Amino acid sequence: MQPFDVIVVGKGNAALCAAIAARDETGARVAMLEAAAVDESGGNSRFAGGMMRFVYNSVEDLRLLADISDDEANNTDWDTNTQDQYYDDLYRVTGFRTDPRLSEIMITQSLQAMVWLRSLGVRFVPNYRAASAVVDGRRRFFGGMAIEVSGGGPGLVQYLDAAALKKGIEIFYETRAVSLIYDGERVLGVQAKHAGKVAEYRAGAVILACGGFEANPEWRTRYLGPGWELAKVRGTRFNMGEGLKMALDIGACPYGNWSGRHVTSWERHAPEFGDLALDHACHRHNYPLSLMINADGKRFVDEGAEFYGYTYAKYGEEVFKQPEQFAWQVFDAKVIPLLRPEYHGKVATRVTAQTLEELAGKMEGVNPEGFLKTVREFNAAVRKDIPFNPGIKDGLCTVGIVPPKSNWAQPLDTPPFEAYHTTAGITFTFGGLRIDPETGQVLDVNLHPIPGLYTAGEMVGGLFYFNYPLGSGLVSGTVFGRIAGVAAGAAARAA
């Protein structure tokens, strides 16, 4: 087989960005190895919502990316996500463990990366759907997430696919990488299996961008702990950890939160793996407006601690820790009109009632007496002197109960009532490889660069610990995918 300059393993956002950067910015001959068939390709990026967290100081920064009219610009509160805000959010949600240099590069290059994506044909639109609300007749964005990719994750992959094909990048589908070709000094390519046969793909550099181990129940049990083999998987069934294993087998240094994971509230009866046909029908992200109730009929988290983008990636784990690994999100008529469309989709396990007593009898697996007691205590604890405002952290809280509800706490007292059955859905795992942040080159256990080996995307360890600010994953994949692509292409071409 004709050798290439760069082999990219994977075909999600990070992999595509790496391949395009290597081809476009260094002139390298690039091939991609994708384990999935064409219709299932795209990795976890196909299952993403398309929201991307980047630095912006005003609506003028947003207008570099999206077509925003003067009327929209002047009559909307667009929020901000300054460098300082981004640093504060990332350090806070990761318990100040995020790698300083990795996070600095991701944050400071985030807007530039978004502009680069737009130059490749990626279309962005205001995120009216999930990050804004109309308050006192004026639209207000919140959570620093004012822009999303048109068409979500599938749209992002489609745009980047088109760019890759236009630039002459060759893609081998149903070709699962199984090992690195390594002579003891440098990586020389990849061995991969297609149609039951193993072939060699030689190259001057290899970029591993094929995700974590979230689809591998054996690895989940090993690294995340007993019981995690039972969790639903939000995304692709192809992320089995092979890229990590290949790198570790030749002495790459593991790094980051290997027992950590991005886990969200998910439809209780969703399929075992993500299903592209369901789009985002299984997401349950409106829990800040709910009471989350376990089998004992008790609350177990502060639902209103933050906007969902700062808690959703860890609250799924809290749901999974409950008896029988489920919870119910309970709403009343005051907030039901604010629920996202997926709550009323065909796949939602939903029960409705005109009284709380009736609702208690319909919530499968829940102790009715415990639930009614919880609601009575909650309603009595809600402050009455603070107005409800879903567009800000309104401080409408409870007093004297544990756990508290810090924002958006309204009495559950207005029929009809609705409850949604949820469990945990794993998106990706946090453990990865240690890299040189400036190049994306993988380091060995002695912290020396491994010649010819680079990584990007979920496989970069050290960015996320315990939790995750919404939209950072796609931006990390873009920033470090581009960095790895340029460095790998340049090194291969110079060899």
Predicted region positions:
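Helix-rich C-terminal "cap"/substrate-channel and partner-interaction subdomain
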Residues: 320-417, 487, 491
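A glycine-rich dinucleotide-binding beta-alpha-beta segment and adjacent secondary-structure elements
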Residues: 179, 370-467
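An anion/pyrophosphate-binding glycine-rich loop and adjacent beta-alpha core
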Residues: 240, 244-370
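Glycine-rich loop(s) and the adjacent beta-strand/alpha-helix scaffold that form part
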Residues: 194-197, 201-270, 440, 471-474, ...
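Rossmann-like flavin
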Residues: 73-137, 354-377
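Conserved redox-cofactor binding core of oxidoreductases
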Residues: 101-198, 217-219, 265-269, 375, ...
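Beta1/beta-strand and adjacent pyrophosphate-binding region of the FAD-binding site
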Residues: 1-14, 31
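Glycine-rich FAD pyrophosphate-binding loop
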Residues: 24-45
